[in-house]
Amino acid sequence: LEFKKIGNEKWSNFCDNKLVFIPSVTTGISYRYAPWGNPEWPRIERNPQQFKERLEFELKYLDKNYRILFITEFNNFFEEALVEPDSKYGFGMLLALKEVLEKYNI
């Protein structure tokens, strides 16, 4: 999350009340079919617990006037970046999302 924190802080500072920064979160991806990318980039593993941690992290960057958070993929089957139920985690991603939204009353 350190990599994401640095980027979010730069964008948040850049916006300085003139633009709205809308953070985004991913469930993570499977690298099985998507081996490309820079090997130095941090891997974004996919599981409900890490998705939940990323959600809670991104909520810190919500604009107080526009409480919007993008989920970058809802059903990207190619990279297995999906929120909807699947054979590996069942309803795990949706339950993680529900838990965080209820915890923060969103």
Where are these regions (language model features)?
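Surface-exposed amphipathic alpha-helices with a cationic face
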Residues: S12-C15, K98-E102
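Substrate-binding cleft of secreted/luminal carbohydrate-active enzymes
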Residues: I22, I44-K88, M93, V100-Y104
